[in-house]
């Protein structure tokens, strides 16, 4: 059975079990989702762990009875009468939103029914392996003005072996969770009460990690012919009216007044880059022009969807806008794809998924422009030998796009690079260049990011490596520990030498026991731990331990330096 149908059926059984145990609970919705399912309930009390165990037991009883899923068609009025009688207020609200004349319900054992499009399994006995996972709060329809419901998450698979493997992966994901590891490792924190939700504070180690990523970005962009620009974080509301963001994106924008004039905290960088493009007349000989910025943007996200570094209200992205001629378009797309693939490998991601989203029903621009841009995106992918999935009609209204999602160590997908054609902004800002015939011509505009949001990418890195970052990215690469105070001067001598070579070194000469200090360094995921005592002082060597591995033994300083340099180059 396909997993969507299986999980949807399991969600139905979950709702039936809850209604049998707590008849007063009101039903919300219960779809299948990626990796599982959920069901929302209106209940005064939150479900406890003991409640979840009871619900699982009741679900198993329903499954063991092998009750049939029976579909019935009702007209809209009949359905409203039925759910009014059952006092299922949220089902009535759903029916008010339905425009069709007919709706379907599913029954099991003539005891339980639910408003549902289906499909379902033929009977409950087809559900072989399931598990309830967690409880959370969720606003009805995701709106904070609506009642808060209680959401039960679960998952289901066709076999117990698949379920066991999935639960093992979930446990590993918890161990790697960047929301836990990030603060533990001293990378970042989010001070919800003091400063606000979704706003990231980088601690010293996190700031070093971010700067290393930024340095890589700047070096690689300049090497590839990009020009760096920087724009203000605020600008007049008029700019956003002209760009169209005010009409389409206002609810996600931070808007305020200064001296009776409206200003906006920028949610995107593109209008600012366009103003720089417009600052002088451009010739076809100047194109392509590639403006790049590590641009911080601010977007209002509802508190319910904020999630560590993955979904925040202020973030920085490696944002670039390319202005080119139609003839240059495919070449620019190909160059961006090369950049993305190389960057993924540099940071240790070897697998990714590519999606091409094409023209939606409602779009702006000329059909011929859409066809040309889509063809350029497709041909670039094919010429690089990259497999991709087409999402018909899923492009933005202003242009087709490529999305590249990286796969981490647990095979989870993370949104990363985007290459987006834009037919709207060049028209709104009346962009032009002088072509070979001396005529004003509209340039093609590409939005693109390589790593995307640096916050999200750092979250992905932490989880991919379970916090143990590769040596070149580690905020502290080496920590030196003298066994006693009398060996501290020798430890400082080694530190100074490694410092002078550009390595990131810490000295731990605290009075704690050596084992305790080593354990602390292991928890901090510091790649190399050096211990120095009398023997090391006499021989001018260091005792080397690699984090997560056994003692590597004694090395000369030259051997250690060579090893570190080679590992950084890898």
Where are the regions that the model predicts?
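NTP/phosphate- and nucleic-acid-binding module
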Residues: 1-26, 32-570
